[in-house]
């Protein structure tokens, strides 16, 4: 996706942002109930220490969520090398305005993406540019969105549509077409299931 952090020029407060609301509603709808149940809830209790130390940061109200954006501190912890922070926006994101530095004809390149931490000014939010460098942008700018979540690795994934697709493909390859078809029928309109049946 390619979205603004906020719909209007206002303070970059993650819990109150339009982008957070989109993740909790529209993005949530992309998951089946079984998939959503396997996403572990997390309490985001961002403090001033989670933001870029070169900018003024304040503590945020703790909030429980399932899907979120990484904070500045999390990026430094999990993606310490600038090269690791580069991400190529999807065709969907590019069609909605995501910046793309590279070769669009072959889909190789990088895209800017939001972090949930405040930026340098009160109406700015932190982001990573196409080089993987930390920057600050006005909250009304449209940038790439890279959702983050914590999965419960002990969850039974057999009910996940992707796992069911894999099982159906294996059954079809073994010649058990009736069982494969029955499994695909349970997937309904899940994206990609029709292509697998061909």
Annotate each PLM feature.
Residues 21, 25, 29, 170, ...:
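Charged/polar, solvent-exposed surface patches and flexible loops
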């Amino acid at each position: 996706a390619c979205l603004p952090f906020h719909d209007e020029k206002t303070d970059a407060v993650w819990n109150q942002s339009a982008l957070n609301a989109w993740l909790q509603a529209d993005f949530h709808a992309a998951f089946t109930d079984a998939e959503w149940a396997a996403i572990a809830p997390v309490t985001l209790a961002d403090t001033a220490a989670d933001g870029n130390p070169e900018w003024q940061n304040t503590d945020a109200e703790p909030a429980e969520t399932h899907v979120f954006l990484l904070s500045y501190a999390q990026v430094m912890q999990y993606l310490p090398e600038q090269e690791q922070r580069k991400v190529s926006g999807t065709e969907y994101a590019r069609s909605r305005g995501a910046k793309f530095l590279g070769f669009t004809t072959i889909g190789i390149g990088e895209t800017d993406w939001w972090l949930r931490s405040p930026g340098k000014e009160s109406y700015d939010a932190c982001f990573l540019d196409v080089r993987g460098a930390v920057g600050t942008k006005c909250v009304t700018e449209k940038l790439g969105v890279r959702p983050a979540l914590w999965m419960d690795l002990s969850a039974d994934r057999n009910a996940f549509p992707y796992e069911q697709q894999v099982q159906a493909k294996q059954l079809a390859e073994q010649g058990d077409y009736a069982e494969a078809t029955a499994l695909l029928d349970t997937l309904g309109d899940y994206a990609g299931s029709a292509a697998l049946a061909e």
